[in-house]
Amino acid sequence: MASWLYECLCEAELAQYYSHFTALGLQKIDELAKITMKDYSKLGVHDMNDRKRLFQLIKIIKIMQEEDKAVSIPERHLQTSSLRIKSQELRSGPRRQLNFDSPADNKDRNASNDGFEMCSLSDFSANEQKSTYLKVLEHMLPDDSQYHTKTGILNATAGDSYVQTEISTSLFSPNYLSAILGDCDIPIIQRISHVSGYNYGIPHSCIRQNTSEKQNPWTEMEKIRVCVRKRPLGMREVRRGEINIITVEDKETLLVHEKKEAVDLTQYILQHVFYFDEVFGEACTNQDVYMKTTHPLIQHIFNGGNATCFAYGQTGAGKTYTMIGTHENPGLYALAAKDIFRQLEVSQPRKHLFVWISFYEIYCGQLYDLLNRRKRLFAREDSKHMVQIVGLQELQVDSVELLLEVILKGSKERSTGATGVNADSSRSHAVIQIQIKDSAKRTFGRISFIDLAGSERAADARDSDRQTKMEGAEINQSLLALKECIRALDQEHTHTPFRQSKLTQVLKDSFIGNAKTCMIANISPSHVATEHTLNTLRYADRVKELKKGIKCCTSVTSRNRTSGNSSPKRIQSSPGALSEDKCSPKKVKLGFQQSLTVAAPGSTRGKVHPLTSHPPNIPFTSAPKVSGKRGGSRGSPSQEWVIHASPVKGTVRSGHVAKKKPEESAPLCSEKNRMGNKTVLGWESRASGPGEGLVRGKLSTKCKKVQTVQPVQKQLVSRVELSFGNAHHRAEYSQDSQRGTPARPASEAWTNIPPHQKEREEHLRFYHQQFQQPPLLQQKLKYQPLKRSLRQYRPPEGQLTNETPPLFHSYSENHDGAQVEELDDSDFSEDSFSHISSQRATKQRNTLENSEDSFFLHQTWGQGPEKQVAERQQSLFSSPRTGDKKDLTKSWVDSRDPINHRRAALDHSCSPSKGPVDWSRENSTSSGPSPRDSLAEKPYCSQVDFIYRQERGGGSSFDLRKDASQSEVSGENEGNLPSPEEDGFTISLSHVAVPGSPDQRDTVTTPLREVSADGPIQVTSTVKNGHAVPGEDPRGQLGTHAEYASGLMSPLTMSLLENPDNEGSPPSEQLVQDGATHSLVAESTGGPVVSHTVPSGDQEAALPVSSATRHLWLSSSPPDNKPGGDLPALSPSPIRQHPADKLPSREADLGEACQSRETVLFSHEHMGSEQYDADAEETGLDGSWGFPGKPFTTIHMGVPHSGPTLTPRTGSSDVADQLWAQERKHPTRLGWQEFGLSTDPIKLPCNSENVTWLKPRPISRCLARPSSPLVPSCSPKTAGTLRQPTLEQAQQVVIRAHQEQLDEMAELGFKEETLMSQLASNDFEDFVTQLDEIMVLKSKCIQSLRSQLQLYLTCHGPTAAPEGTVPS
């Protein structure tokens, strides 16, 4: 038995005194009971800690001896007066037993004086006295988790269970509980088993079988697994005297010893018992944790599933250590990576699979790419309702080392901050996604590791500044949403509230379908963190709501009885409540800067159009939403309005609905439909693929899914205006009906509905929309759709007949639906609408504009010229889709401008042409993925750029308007136009005045219709007053006037070229040349179609702008774009036509395809000091062109349309770059040589006989420099004369220069992004100043590139070019 004595001393950490014990003749454990305090010195035990250990050991042995006597003499009355035992403690509970005897000895006897016994629980239950002693022992020596103590729970039904307990030195650790309880010799312990529903109401989950009974991986039986990991006390905590209060009893049971004080000041220990799927003590390594938690997930993803593993817990509890680990003890990331690569190498069928990694964080509800300089990301939903992180950079890794290096790089970018508990606490949720893809980049499986931000009570925050509070609030809100999602999934609720936070939205794919989730709750053992630890354990327990610990002792009747009661807490956290209230802080945070002039949220609640306002066959769709730009605040509140995304998925920004004049509202409907149509087109095109033609018939089905509701607020408007505007719009709308059934004029619906009824319906629809959209997205937008405004100016004759071709309708509807769907699916998060993001978008819009072209154009390269034209036209339509955003932007711009109606009217003023439009062409044309679609697929930066371009240029609005007008026009045209060959032009020159003066923004839109060669051209000019004056010009000339109230720009009068042979004239290449700013006129035949759509009738007419045109445009960018420039420059450009046969062969083909439709594109440069999207949008809005019969590609002044229409702006270099990139990508585009552009003055090859030049009118001083003459030159023969080899070399030089410029612009873009991200904390004036500096740098960068472009044009342009060179 000496060996048993030695073991006992070892356990008590007294092994060094074993020789002293044997020297005194102590050979057996029971002999230790004879030792007294006087013998300690004889045994050589002088250290006080050792003496305490020895004393406790002797005390335990004496108790056990008395226990043995009690077993042998049951009738003996036990004397317990020396022990403070409450009667309540006699209840059954865990029994900790020390056993130092061999199992064989235990078989021979139930009790032994030699050591502690190991016996069955039935023996305990048979003897209450014995259990009393054990209870006392338990009170004295709570076990510590690090020693893996096992506890048997004594209950009536568990009598047969057999418990074996190991004990370790911690039981004898000095002052284990005395440190907690002070002088209390035997603390009173109350045991509380935290079973399901212990604190949060009764759970609905079913009893789960004990995990110890499971032999298979947990992923085969459960969707969610909750584990707990306890970290050891740190050295610093030990020095501070903190006590370990956590005990890991077994692999599923955890005890927390909480110090409590009764009312009578009696101190006691409250023992909390928790049950989890797996409990890891502090001795467990990351490898142990990995094998039990993540390893089964790796197997799962190789079976084609999704998996998520996330660490949760208080800051400083070991989450990051668990996930990332150290070099010596790698975390779950590294272990999973090793496992993945090992499986890829071993399994032959998996040789073709590759590993991709992405790393981003969610900080304060925003997404940032940690592998791409913290670039802002956006979470969107695709058509399959799968969440896509737009712009997320994914890196392919081929080794564990590279993967860890990538993770290390991203970890350095994480947002951290000092908290009350941890000096370097993670203040963001870090998401590492490891994806397994095949060679075609199809995702085979994906696992996400999430290192959640540290949860912490607001009261514990070290800093009380606003940012810290917002961080904490965001973290806690997202964690609450995460818990609710997991519980809803585990209990199979019908609705899972994924949209309550950005975290759950991003993790949606990890929780649905064939997805497995593992939660690792990390806890600290220190008594200082008791409350945090309990909160973490309760959170984890609530997530799983396990009942396995009580499956034997909880009666069925009691469970059923209590299950009916839901705690108020459960009800409070219901998804409905959270969506409205919990997210409100975020909503306020994001939206407070966007509209300073917006009325109180209550007053701005948007009204929705009555359902009756929509034609019967048109699906309700909503216009895309664009985040309000800063500039928007300038507009009067009355013009603010919100475009609601479709109720299905979109979001409505409550309080953003600005009041609308009824006249606008009518157009709104039709506009919405049109926009929706465009959108759908884009969608379908994406689905069908870049090369496939887009068939409107298919699209129509898509539209039907979408419901459009556009809120309109009442505004006092004369009934005359109302009826005037609405009639046209309604008529147009009815055109859009999908099935081509006779469309009844929408005007009837409007006029028949009492205003109060409309308001009620609008209010209800808007109200219900809010519940279907994340509140974060409900921000105020301060813009109104220009299309709607323009529509009211539409000549009555524009109304469509019932014959509207179904294809067109389906197209528009599809467009609409697609856009809406896409917007909704993408679920524009507040990110996308946030003020900052919009600014960023603005910054990048120029680039986007170029990219927009690329979106459409690059898809059509392989096709024949005719098809290209059609597709380009389609692209134009698609661009409206992309333009949807733009439209919003443009609309927004208009709304900002009190006079926006004028502009809107201009945009809308597309008088119907008299020729049937070639719908089939429209149907066949496919732009490939629409820019919007591309948006979803493209990296964030390009997407933002795209959006930016759209918004800024207003081009988007313009596009939308064009689309709307096109659809209207096309519908009308189809009904009314006798021949497709008639050329109808509508040119709206929109002048953008200084942002401050709405009057200056007035735009004049002149729909020019050439019904026949001799047919009078109707000109609708919109004047500042906002009234459209239809006029006929027998000569066929179109007069455009723009009046500026401020007088900044002198009236610009353009006489449109007369084309006596309207029908015969092929699309002409028209280039608008501005001294300083060259407005591009899209060449109907030559170049790729501008991203802007041409009115549907004019789709044929939509002029693909040749790359040359784009180049010209670039070269013609304003000589000095100064951010402070007051006005966007609008320069009249001569427009020339030449017969298709005289165009370069390619152009001729295009021209043929265009059916000799002429498209004039004016890109108005928006050079205003404000580079915001708002300005751009305004300008873009102004620049919209409507073409009555033949949809015109329209260009917004502020925004260059696709490449050609891009207007140089301070930020336009991006656009130019993109254009160049497009050129590079698509050599097939018309070359400069094809365009035959003169070096500086832009020369379009034209037949002089057929071309009538527009006479340049005085250009605003801002635009034209005195030194830059506008010398349009027409070289009929030089269309394609450049020398190819030399041209290619020169192109390479320009391309290199462009690449450098791209890099510089990217740098400036990043600076601008950073500036915008800091907008909340910066003074706005300072922000504007810094933004102005960035714009100046961008302008210089652009000018540098332009100098190269001018050099190129000088060297390789037509021989006559030099004399017309415009200084750059």
UniProtKB/Swiss-Prot annotation:
Cited Pfam families: Kinesin (PF00225), SAM_1 (PF00536)
Q: Which CDD domains match?
A: KISc_KIF2_like, SAM_KIF24-like
Looking at the record, the residues that make up the SAM domain are 1-64
Keywords per UniProt: ATP-binding, Cilium biogenesis/degradation, Cytoplasm, Cytoskeleton, Microtubule, Motor protein, Nucleotide-binding, Phosphoprotein
Q: Which residues carry this modification: Phosphoserine?
A: 102, 112, 478, 584, 622, 646, 826, 829, 1012
Localization, per the record, is: Cytoplasm, Cytoskeleton, Microtubule organizing center, Centrosome, Centriole; Cytoplasm, Cytoskeleton, Microtubule organizing center, Centrosome
Q: Where is the composition biased (Polar residues)?
A: 557-576, 839-849, 871-881, 1106-1119
Q: What segment(s) does the record annotate as region Interaction with MPHOSPH9?
A: 478-709
Amino acid composition bias (Basic and acidic residues), ranges on this chain: 882-906, 1138-1148
Q: Which residues carry this modification: Phosphothreonine?
A: 621
Q: Which GO terms describe its molecular function?
A: ATP binding; identical protein binding; microtubule binding; microtubule motor activity
Q: Which family does it belong to?
A: Belongs to the TRAFAC class myosin-kinesin ATPase superfamily. Kinesin family.
What functional role does this protein have?
Microtubule-dependent motor protein that acts as a negative regulator of ciliogenesis by mediating recruitment of CCP110 to mother centriole in cycling cells, leading to restrict nucleation of cilia at centrioles. Mediates depolymerization of microtubules of centriolar origin, possibly to suppress aberrant cilia formation. Following activation by NEK2 involved in disassembly of primary cilium during G2/M phase but does not disassemble fully formed ciliary axonemes.
Write down what this protein is called.
Kinesin-like protein KIF24
Q: Which organism is it from?
A: Homo sapiens (Human)
